[in-house]
């Protein structure tokens, strides 16, 4: 317990009080609608709604609190569309400014953390592709992974409590609680109903803030427990823990696991020095060099942790234990797996010669062709079998605009999947887009694809057909023999900060 107390003292976050008055400042809504903070608010037109003034916001909050939400439930609001429209307008207007205000403590804390650790705030640190070189270096030596789907739904009060550990402004928390309960009943959970779906779409900024704070709360506890269970302490993550009832919850968690109060004795059961954790969106991966028995212990530990700390039912089937050698992991739009790469070396000593068989583990990243074709079919570029079709919606555009749109999609996919181990599937996707482009142009000119290409020539598709290898050849006009191998190898870029829409399978 003394070590935990010292840990809390080192990681004590700053208290940020008096955020609630910022809701009534007009420039907050200007920033909420225009994220270019480098421009002067006095000399530039920020393009926000001029109705978001001090007086208007005060009236909106007053009207929101005057509504009797216990009488007008969600079912009653369906019978009164006028009340629903006005109430949604009040909540959405205030929530936009509120989400921006609550982000202030998080951004300040992140900035101070970078300054303390002397880390340069570079865009390259945010690149999605930067995680794959890490997987190449570490996952090839591991045996098992826990494929975890972060559980939800979460009760709205738990979301408010998570923010309470970061914010000390009670008025702001009361307003957040009121906004959330405008869409969900107090005794219900956040479920994918029409109300919650409407809330998440209209208030994406606030919804993402709440979800990220919920995931951060889980990860802060998890990293702390992970550090306690290993001799190799993690130094790359800044960890903040809940201050309220921390010792009591840790004691309950430990008692459930083995019925004793010694934290180290319990964590000894899951001690594993070689373990890696990766998360993106609602999916996380816990990879280890241990055995399946050890991974089952971690699975039980995580299920117990979620149920007791978040008062949330975490079904064990949301965690899958897979062996890396015979399982493909779907992550960030790629299918990743560890395969044995055999190599034969012929050695000769004097008159004797013999062959040496070596098998090296290698991480392969493949294009999930079937999932990608399903995304293309959903976007009306091909049918479900992968046969290209025309895009009639774009047939009214100019030829150059049509080619530019198809070419941009092809380049973006080629750019995102440049790290694929095998390019054959990527070439098939580019073929579908190329033929779909040709059929769209032929449909516009009321001609066949063959006649259209013969009449206008294939030079119209030169930009569309440019590959990553062509871009490299333009960068290095006369490549050496060593660079020729680079063209055929995997290329990871540090400028990709979000997943491609077609690769984001849902």
Swiss-Prot record:
One of its GO terms (molecular function) is RNA binding. GO terms for cellular component: chloroplast. Transmembrane segments: none annotated. Its main location: plastid. Keywords: Chloroplast, mRNA processing, Plastid, RNA-binding, tRNA processing. It holds the Pfam family MatK_N. It is found in: Plastid, Chloroplast. GO terms for biological process: mRNA processing; RNA splicing; tRNA processing. It comes from the Eukaryota. Usually encoded in the trnK tRNA gene intron. Probably assists in splicing its own and other chloroplast group II introns. PANTHER family: MATURASE K. Belongs to the intron maturase 2 family. MatK subfamily. This is Maturase K. It comes from Artanema fimbriatum. The gene is matK.
